[in-house]
């Protein structure tokens, strides 16, 4: 559902079926942003985020958690402490998702990159 929304909004979406696959793909083809649920198979979204933020190749990639995970309700700061840049509770609308993503990726596109 989210992939369809994002594709319709003009984003190039790559999907992973579990946390390890997402991590491997991010290392090989670093995305502009990682959008993840916190409750995913394999390594969960918390561990996925910690590993992404702990690796030099992917530490600068923003992570948006979109979740209805029960632990989020009892401790909303847990995802942020794991390294998520933002958290969006489910259910969310297509507009809410797009706005959250653009808030995270647009500042990156404005950064001045040093000459190589």
Across the structure, where does each feature detected by a protein language model lie?
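C-terminal output helix
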Residues: 92-101
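The short loop immediately C-terminal to the conserved phospho-acceptor aspartate in CheY-like receiver
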Residues: 12, 34, 38-39
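Charged docking surfaces used in two-component/phosphorelay signaling
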Residues: 3-8
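Residue-level signal for the "D+5" position in two-component response regulator receiver
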Residues: 15, 40-43
């Amino acid at each position: 559902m989210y992939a369809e929304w994002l594709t319709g909004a003009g984003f190039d979406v790559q999907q992973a079926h579990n946390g390890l696959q997402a991590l491997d793909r991010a290392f090989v083809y670093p995305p502009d942003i990682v959008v993840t649920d916190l409750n995913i198979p394999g390594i969960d979204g918390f561990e996925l985020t910690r590993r992404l933020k702990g690796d030099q190749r992917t530490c600068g990639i923003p992570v948006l958690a979109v979740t209805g995970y029960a632990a989020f309700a009892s401790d909303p700061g847990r995802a942020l402490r794991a390294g998520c840049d933002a958290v969006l509770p489910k259910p969310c609308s297509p507009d809410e998702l797009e706005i959250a993503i653009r808030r995270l990726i647009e500042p990156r596109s404005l950064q001045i990159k040093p000459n190589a």
